[in-house]
Amino acid sequence: MDPPAAVLLPPQSRTCTHLAEETCMDQERSPATAEAGRDSFPSGQLPSSSLTEADWFWDEHIQAKRARVETIVRGMCLSPSSSVSGRARESLRCPEKGRERKRKQSLPMHQGPLKSSPAWERGPKKGGTRVKEQLHLLKQQLRHLQEHVLQATEPRAPAQSPGGTEPRSSPRARPRNSCSSGAWTVENEPHQSSSKDLCGAVKPGAAEVLQYSEEPMLCPSGPRALVETLRKELSRAVSQAVDSVLQQVLFDPQRHLTQQERSCQGLASEGRNQPSPPGRSAYKDPLALATLPRKIQPQAGVPLGNSTLARPLDSPMCPVSPRGVPRSYQSPLPNCPLTNVPSHTWENQMLRQLLGRGPDGQWSGSPPQDAAFQSHTSPESAQQPWGLSQQQLPLSLTPVHLESRPLPPPVKMEQGVLRGVADSLPFSSIHIQEGLSPGHLKKAKLMFFFTRYPSSSLLKAYFPDVQFNRCITSQMIKWFSNFREFYYIQMEKYARQALSDGITNAQALAVLRDSELFRVLNTHYNKGNDFEVPDCFLEIAALTLKEFFRAVLAGKDSDPSWKKPIYKVISKLDSDVPEMLKSPSFLPGLFPS
């Protein structure tokens, strides 16, 4: 640079020119960049010939294209590690201001007569050949930057500098020391592209483009890159595991059941050959613990060592119908002792069974759960035949004994997964059931003779063979609500009928065993007349009939809530339920043993 030119240029232009000269040296001093570097000389060295107005518009078009290309190149050079601050964006606009200030100071000294021609200030810099050379240079630089970015985004392969000796550092951008300079440099960058025209061609709108386009250009570095890599690897591994399990389940479910049946048979033979001490586990293969179902039908003479096996895989919400297990797999295997199992072994084997892995690390599947089996509401369970729902032997353990046994630590798992694992096992159910059967409905109707408003604790005490949860409890409460509704409808009907027959005294009303009202109630609650209706129920029925008769006679039925006082009176007249109804084997004709 000539000394006069250095004197005439303002500080901002000199800074930009200094940066352009440094980048030109990095590009091996190519002729094109050297020629681009001379564009910032004082306009006193410009040729005296002027351009036509068409050439001036052509130069404006070329300058716009150059600005777009340089914006793309500059965006690829910048780092996404931090957003462009307001100070940096302001520095990108400084080169244009420096060039304008340079022209305004240099033109009066060397081109005084041409002050009014703005086209003369920009025209001589950009000849056709020079623009083509600069575009060619920018294309080469863009190609080099693309290769550099591809190398930087390759995972697990540490890229090296062109010399091959130093590893390239993470692409972090930093501003130059001068706040007026708009150039950004990348550490250890082998292909930096910049020139004097590059410093001045970035317009104020380009800074905003750079701010939003630099984020997806380069990959994150340092701890952020490590975190992203770990996330991708973990998600990929989990996806592969889930896909493998689903393929096994959907395409080959029977093979999984056959393998489980073989393993249980092998364990049964080991149990016969190696007797275990009482209270300890006879299994050394941990897979046996995972194949223990929640429903097991005990054989005669086979001891049940621990009642924790009765509820290892209980569903937390609603019951599952026994139809979920195929018919061919409901027969129990003989000589399969059920003994105490350590709690920590339960956790490991439950998780292994859910993941579908055996002890040898091989993946195995479970049969798909039919949509029809997912329905486990009480209407479906009530439609099951008694023979299917009551295929169990009497249990030697009392309910108090069952509740006193410690349970293994709970394993938090999805309800659908638990149901699919348990229903796929080749075992039948034990005495404790999760669904309600027609026998339970019949027993509830008989209990209505003694109590019209039972509590949940009373229901649990008189249904020891049912595994209670919210669905079971609410279903039984709904049963008794329906019983009461039918009962009150009949009482109101016969009270109005007595009033229409001309009866005016409520004391004349009574419910006898040969009356029509008793026949209707006995047919509904004691179908088949298998149970003798207690006398206390006849007294409660007569009292209810009188209460309805008095209310209708007094005209209280015009009030929408006229039945509530009657309900309150009847709710206080519940009597004790006989202890014989607690036995699951009560009434052999209804509850086959």
UniProtKB/Swiss-Prot annotation:
Residues 24-48, 79-130, 153-199, 260-284, 298-333, 356-388 are annotated as: Disordered. Residues 433-591 are annotated as: Homeo-Prospero. The keyword Transcription regulation applies. SUPFAM superfamilies: Homeodomain-like (SSF46689). PROSITE patterns: HOMEO_PROSPERO. Residues 492-591 form the Prospero domain. Residues 87-99 have a biased composition (Basic and acidic residues). Belongs to the Prospero homeodomain family. The Prospero-type homeodomain and the adjacent Prospero domain act as a single structural unit, the Homeo-Prospero domain. This is Prospero homeobox protein 2. It comes from Mus musculus (Mouse). The gene is Prox2.
